[in-house]
Each structure stands twice: as C-alpha cells, then as structure tokens.
C-alpha cells in the first residue's frame, strides 16, 4: 500500500505524511475522492517518497514529478507551518526578505507601461474621477508619454492571414493583469472600471517621487507658468522661443567604465564632429549595453547615429532674452524646443535677439526640432530662418494668427471612429491645440497660420514625414524613400522633419534603415526623430505645435527688418506649387535619358542640366564644334571644370551626336 511506502530521504517524511493527510481530507468530503484525484495524490506521494534529495521549498516541490500548479498550491500549507524563516527566503517572491524583513513591494520599472498606467490612474482619480474605463485609460496613458512602449495595440500587428499568434496580438495593456494580481489596481463592473487600491496609490506616489514628476499637471504653456516662485531654481531661461512642459529628471547611471577601453583611433573618428571624449564614451556604453557587442571597432557607426539622435532629442539649457516681458526663469526639468537650427546658428550674428542657443545636454524626450536646410551645403543655412506670414506694421504674430496642425487625410489615424482618432482628440485637449485633417500634396503633416479675423491661411516653414520601420524598409527597396525626400526638398519648406516609428533593430533591414536615417540627417539636412509608436508620434506633433507657436508668438512686422523678405505662401498657392512640381517637364525627360548613359551619375546629370536644360540646347552646342570630334567629346568635361568625367562626357556625346 502507498501508506506503507518507504521514504528514501528522512527529511521528506513530514511532507509525505502531509500528502496523505490531504488525501484523507478529500476522501472524507461528501462527494468523496474521485478516481482521477486519488490517482493524483498517489502519484505525488510516490514521487515524494522516491525523492533522494530534501524538498525544502515550494520551488523544489514544483520540480518533482506529479506536482502541478494545483498540487503545489495545496501543499503550501505545509511549508507555511514549517520553519518559516529559512524556507521563505528561498521562495522567488521573498528573496529580498533578508534585507527588507518581509515581502518586497512590487514597483513597475521606470517608463514601462505599468508605470504609465499607475501614474495616469493616480493623477486622474486624484483630480476627482472615481474610476477610468479601459479605452479612456489607454488613450490617456499613451498621450502622457510616460511609457516608452505603446499602451494600446499597434496598427499593423496581427494582420489577418499572417497567423494570429499571441506574440502578434500582445500589447502593453497586458501588464494590467500584473497590476491587478499584485493588488495595485481593482477591476470591477461590466464594462470594466479600473481603480487604484490604497497600496496602488502608495506605489504610484513612490514612482512619481523617484522620477521627479509633478503630481498632476503634465503640460503647461508659457502663459500659464508663474515664473516668480521658480526664479530661485534656475536662472537665465527664456520662454520666448520655446514651450514649456514638465519633464522627468534625468537618470544618472552610477556605473562608470574606463575610457581606456576605447582605442584612441576610434575616439579620433568623432573629433571632427565636435563630440567630447566623455560623450563618445557614454554613447559607446549605451550602445554596447543594448546590442551585447563590446567591440568598439564594430560599433562606431551605431555610436555616431546615437550621438546624432542625442542632438536631436535634446533640451536647451538656456536661451537668450529677446523680450522683457518673457524673460522669466524656469525649472531645469522644463523642456525647451529649439526651432532655429544648428546650421543656421553658425552663420547668424550673436547679437540677434531672436536666436536660440544650441542644445548641449538634455533628456531623451526633448526635441531639438528643426535644423534642416534645403541643401546639404552648410552655407545655405544662413537663409534657413522660417518666414513670417503677412503682418501689418507693428503687429505681432500672436495678435493676428492662430497656429493649426494639419494632418493628411490619408493617414490611418485621421479616419473617423478609429482608436487613433480618439488619441488625436486627446492630444488636442491635452496640449490645447487645434488639429484639422485635409488632403496634403506632400508630407504627412504641416502647420498653417490662420488669420483670426480674415480667415486667410498661410503655410509655415515646417513639414514632417512619418514612417514606421516596415514602411521605411519597403520604401527603400522600391525607391519611394528617395522620391519622397526629393519632393519634400523641392516643396520650398525651410524645416524638414523625418519621423521614424519603431525600433529598426527588430527589422531584417536594420543596417539599411540606420544608414538611410544617418545620410538623411547628416548629408541632406533633415531632422530625423525617433518614436516608439503612433501615440508618441502624435505627442511629438503636439510638442512641435506648441513650440512653433511660441517661436512665432512675439514676432513683429518691422519694415526695416522685413524689406525684401519673402512671406509664407498661402495654402492654395502651396497646393498649386506642389501640383506643378509633379508635372513632367522636358528637362525631367532629358534627365531620365541622361541617367541611362553609362558612367553618368545623378550629380553628373544635374551638372549637364545646369548648363543645357534640354536635349536641343545640348545638340546646338555640339553643332558649333562639328568639325572637331575630339573637342565635342571633351566639351562637357571642359565646361563643367571636370565635374563631368571624361568617360561620361564622351558617352553623352555618343548618345546625342553619335552615328
């Protein structure tokens, strides 16, 4: 009989007896002991008796054959009544008991979805709401940007026909189950209502205190801030060309790695770009931690991308005063957004009161919005200052215009009734901005200035193109990426912004995407911004809208300064200009023909078009040298000062004039 079975390990006799005791308790119940349940107890009893090692914890028991979740839970009473101090320390949930004298409280990781949900629930319920619904909570948590990952399901995941796996349908909302199991959130009613428990409110407060966040208000405009009590904190902050918002205090990693681990020849690669050794070492540390690769020689390109992204995601430590009534100081965690652009600053006078200083340090969320130029040549930066819409003499922009964000109606989040449209509406209320949806001839979003009384609309010098990682990969492969960038550059905007959603490291074309972003920013003058998903992108639009308004807000029409200066085009003229750019011209056809010639690159084709915009004009030039074939073959090379190589010059001549 099983009752008389010998226990191999004497220390397990008590556990074996406890299994038999539980079996007897179930047998004495009115329903009795079912055949399956009896078999389960017998199997578990035999396994305990045959175990050669002592079973001291529930974790040890779970590894014994015959003890599933139900049996382990049933045996918990035995371990609770045993020698608690030694046994409980070995349980996974209680290993911290040696230091904390008890079970460690569950606290979500900083910038995780659980972290964002707890703080969002805490703020809303503190401000008078008793509970929040699921979709309301998802939209609010997505909008506040406290989570690095999207809270709701991302569009494009779990597409029909591609296998409905759990991984495809997983979203950040899944962590709500953990919060409920840990006793931090209570779910009730149908449809569900979510409320914080007393412990959940304590954990939310602890998260807020650890990260330096304010208790309630996320975003404040400059007009809503009272600089007087903050003057003691951080001087020399200028709100004229920036909007302000509460920001998390930067996390300082206590670990420090030796600078000598990076070879000097690798460090010297970053010197021409103006980066300090400390910046390079810190970037190497972050990149190597994320990739697992510790070899500096293979990481330097990724580090360069990381440093450039750090410049884009920067906060401005200080700005110059331009107006007496707007020179209030602000806290160090208030975000500043630079709209002038680092290239333009190099060529502008330091006495220009409207100039913003370059950003040197800041948080991972701050936006140095627009340093783009229409050409990669740095000398063009001097003309890269955004234009003003028409103003009467002495009239400020704030008195005459409102800034409105225009989204392309072909974007998914512009569809009525979609979840993303609810996020758009939430962004409107959260940032107190106006958003409209229209058909745009180029780009995914622009900003217009609408006259408060005349209702006339003028397009401001800012345009953004948005792509997720999958779209980026496909557009690179079919050359749409190159064509779209060219359309943006030809559209006449001063500030070009490219937003990439998602992590390229998870794509099979990761290196191609990183290289494309690198060249787009470094060589072509775009501002490349990275976001984690649609919610953060819309939030980024909100930041840019506020900062653009603050940049223009106090600009005044001064005849002495605005003589000969171009003004912003009207919305109708902008649409017409873009439509005209789409029309195929004779020069465009000629350029396509030239690109089919061997040895002719894009630069060579452009050089030919600069001198001879049509095939007829080039043929006419050849006709003047008809008697000298050698001179005809060398004509393009000589007249372009060797920009066009000899082989290309000869091949073009054969195309146009050859027999």
UniProtKB/Swiss-Prot annotation:
Localization annotation: Nucleus; Nucleus, Nucleolus
A molecular-function term among this protein's GO annotations: metal ion binding
Phenotypic effect of disruption: Sensitive to the mutagens MMS and MMC. Increased sensitivity to gamma radiation. Deficiency in homologous recombination in somatic cells but only after induction by genotoxic stress. Decreased pollen viability with morphologically aberrant (small and misshaped) grain. Moderate reduction in meiotic crossovers. The double mutant mus81 send1 exhibits severe developmental defects (e.g.
GO CC aspect terms: condensed nuclear chromosome; nucleolus
Range of residues in the leader sequence: none
UniProt cross-references to InterPro entries, sorted A to Z: EME1/EME2_C, ERCC4_domain, Mus81, Restrct_endonuc-II-like, WH-like_DNA-bd_sf, WH_MUS81, XPF_nuclease_Mus81
Keyword tags: Calcium, Cell cycle, Cell division, DNA damage, DNA recombination, DNA repair, DNA-binding, Endonuclease, Hydrolase, Magnesium, Meiosis, Metal-binding, Mitosis, Nuclease, Nucleus, Repeat
A GO BP annotation: DNA damage response
Gene3D superfamilies documented for this protein: 3.40.50.10130, Crossover junction endonuclease EME1, DNA-binding domain, Winged helix-like DNA-binding domain superfamily/Winged helix DNA-binding domain
Quaternary structure and interacting proteins, as annotated: Forms a heterodimer with EME1A or EME1B.
General remark: Two distinct classes of crossovers have been demonstrated in Arabidopsis. Class I is MSH4 dependent and exhibits crossover interference. Class II is MUS81 dependent and exhibits no interference.
Family label: Belongs to the XPF family.
The protein's name: Crossover junction endonuclease MUS81
């Amino acid at each position: 009989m099983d009752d008389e079975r010998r226990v191999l390990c004497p220390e397990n006799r008590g556990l074996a007896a406890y299994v038999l005791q539980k079996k007897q308790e179930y047998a004495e119940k009115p329903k009795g002991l079912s055949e399956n349940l009896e078999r389960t107890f017998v199997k578990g009893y035999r396994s305990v008796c045959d175990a050669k090692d002592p079973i001291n914890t529930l974790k040890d028991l779970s590894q014994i054959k015959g003890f599933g979740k139900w049996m382990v839970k049933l045996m918990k009473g035995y371990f609770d009544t045993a020698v608690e101090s030694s046994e409980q320390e070995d349980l996974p949930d209680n290993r911290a008991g040696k230091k904390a004298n008890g079970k460690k409280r569950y606290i979500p990781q900083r910038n995780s979805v659980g972290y964002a949900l707890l703080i969002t629930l805490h703020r809303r319920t503190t401000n008078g709401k008793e509970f929040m619904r699921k979709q309301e909570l998802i939209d609010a948590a997505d909008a506040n940007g406290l989570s690095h990952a999207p809270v709701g399901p991302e569009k494009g995941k779990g597409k029909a026909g591609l296998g409905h796996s759990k991984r495809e349908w997983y979203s950040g909302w899944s962590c709500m189950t953990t919060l409920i199991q840990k006793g931090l959130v209570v779910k009730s009613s149908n449809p569900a209502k979510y409320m914080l428990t007393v412990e959940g409110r304590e954990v939310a407060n602890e998260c807020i205190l650890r990260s330096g966040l304010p208790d309630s208000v996320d975003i404040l405009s400059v007009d809503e801030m009272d600089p007087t009590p903050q003057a003691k904190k951080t001087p020399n902050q200028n709100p004229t060309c920036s909007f302000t918002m509460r920001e998390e205090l930067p996390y300082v990693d206590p670990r420090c790695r030796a600078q000598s681990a990076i070879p000097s020849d690798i460090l010297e690669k970053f010197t021409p770009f103006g980066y300090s050794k400390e910046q390079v070492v810190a970037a190497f540390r972050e990149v190597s931690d994320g990739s697992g690769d510790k070899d500096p020689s293979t990481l330097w390109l990724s580090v360069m991308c990381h440093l450039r992204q750090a410049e884009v995601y920067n906060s401005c430590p200080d700005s110059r005063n331009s107006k007496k009534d707007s020179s209030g100081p602000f806290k160090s965690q208030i975000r500043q957004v630079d709209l002038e652009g680092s290239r333009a600053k190099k060529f502008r006078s330091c006495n220009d009161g409207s100039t913003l200083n370059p950003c040197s340090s800041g948080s991972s969320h701050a936006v140095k919005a627009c340093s783009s130029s229409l050409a990669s040549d740095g000398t063009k930066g001097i003309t890269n200052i955004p234009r003003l819409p028409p103003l009467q003499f002495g009239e400020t922009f704030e008195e005459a215009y409102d800034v409105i964000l225009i989204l392309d109606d072909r974007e998914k989040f512009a569809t009525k009734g979609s979840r993303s449209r609810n996020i758009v509406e939430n962004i409107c209320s959260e940032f107190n901005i106006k958003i409209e949806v229209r058909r745009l001839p180029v780009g995914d979003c622009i900003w217009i200035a609408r006259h408060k009384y005349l209702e006339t609309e003028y397009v401001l010098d800012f345009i953004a193109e948005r792509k997720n990682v999958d779209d980026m990969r496909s557009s690179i492969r079919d050359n749409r990426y190159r064509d779209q960038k060219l359309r943006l550059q030809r559209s006449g905007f001063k500030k070009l912004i490219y937003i990439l959603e998602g992590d390229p490291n998870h794509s099979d074309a990761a290196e191609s995407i990183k290289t494309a972003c690198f060249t787009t920013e470094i060589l072509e003058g775009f501002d490349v911004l990275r976001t984690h998903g649609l919610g953060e992108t819309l939030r980024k639009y909100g930041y840019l809208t506020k900062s653009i308004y603050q940049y223009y807000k106090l600009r005044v029409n001064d005849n002495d300064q605005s003589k000969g200066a171009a003004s912003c085009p009207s919305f109708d003229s902008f649409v017409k200009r873009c439509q005209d750019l789409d029309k195929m011209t004779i020069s465009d056809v000629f350029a396509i023909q030239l690109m089919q010639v061997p040895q002719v690159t894009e630069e060579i084709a452009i050089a030919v078009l600069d001198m001879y915009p049509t095939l007829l004009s080039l043929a006419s030039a050849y006709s003047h040298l008809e008697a000298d074939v050698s001179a005809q073959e060398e004509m393009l090379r000589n007249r372009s000062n060797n920009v066009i190589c000899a082989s290309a010059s000869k091949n073009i001549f054969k195309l146009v004039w050859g027999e």
